[in-house]
Every structure is written in C-alpha cells, then in structure tokens.
Regions:
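A structural microfeature
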Residues: 1-2, 112
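Hydrophobic, well-ordered beta-alpha structural blocks that scaffold small-molecule cofactor pockets
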Residues: 39-47, 78, 82, 105
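Conserved GNAT acetyl-CoA-binding A-motif
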Residues: 53-55, 82-95
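Long, positively charged, glycine-interspersed low-complexity recognition regions
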Residues: 53-55, 108-131
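Conserved beta-strand-loop-alpha-helix junction that forms the acyl-donor binding cleft
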Residues: 58-67, 91-100, 118-119, 128-130
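Conserved acetyl-CoA-binding loop-helix of GNAT-fold acetyltransferases
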Residues: 62, 68-81, 105
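Conserved active-site alpha-helix within GNAT-family acetyltransferase domains
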Residues: 73, 85-87, 96-113, 119
Length: 131
C-alpha cells in the first residue's frame, strides 16, 4: 500500500490527523510514555517537512511475503512519474536504516537525521530532487 500526498496536500486534512490521533490514544492506553514519544516524532516530522510544493510519499508498506517482487517499485512509480512531469521533488521519512539504500535506488538522498527521542530510533528525511 502506498499513501501519496500531492503538492499542496500537506499538512494532511483534519480527518487524516484525527485518524493519526486515534492511533496515539491507543498507544497511550497501552503505554502512557508512548504518547509523549509519538508526539515528539510527529512534531519533528512537522518541523522538518519542506514548505515548498513537492510530492510526499507518506507511507509505503509491502507485505513481507511480497517484498523483493517489484511491488514497492510499482506502488511508487506513478508518484515518481508525476513528480518528474511536474518538475518537482519527492520527499519521505523513514525510521529504518535498511530503507535508506532501497530509496537511494530511486534517487532519494538523506536530507536530515533527527533524534526526536534520545533513546528512540532516528528519523531520516529523504529527498529526491526533480529529474
């Protein structure tokens, strides 16, 4: 599954933000300190997000059984083509270091490495410059 935000679509609509908040409330019930940590990550994402128009790969998820089959490429190819046609950059965030080489294959480079929670995983922002 890919969730792509077109230019001008960020920040996300209120309905999407409420769905994210619902996930944070569930985290708080299960682990109260998790809410504060989640809030720090969300604030870091908001602060780091570029303000100029670009294509935003908000989410890319492939079932482990379907990984390494080209599905992830196909899921994001339409966005990459649209960005190229528009002459705009693409942007994403990841917390998984193993994703960095994957996204580099598509022309993304690490823009920033953030540590919203000192004891938590880093958050990398990546950008693919207009092609």
């Amino acid at each position: 599954m890919a969730a792509v935000v077109p230019p001008g679509g960020y920040p996300l609509p209120v309905a999407n933000q409420l769905r994210q908040a619902a996930g944070a409330v569930r985290a708080m019930v299960l682990r109260p300190q998790g809410l504060a940590q989640a809030q720090r990550y969300l604030m870091a994402i908001e602060h780091a997000h570029p303000r100029e128009p670009l294509w935003y790969l908000f989410l890319l998820v492939v079932d482990p059984l379907a990984q390494r089959t080209g599905l992830g490429t196909r899921l994001q190819q339409e966005m990459l083509n649209a960005a190229d046609n528009d002459g705009l950059d693409c942007y994403l965030e990841t917390q998984k270091p193993e994703n960095i080489p994957y996204y580099r294959r598509f022309g993304y480079e690490v823009d920033q490495e953030l540590r919203p929670v000192p004891s938590g995983p880093p958050l990398w922002t990546m950008r693919r410059l207009q092609q």
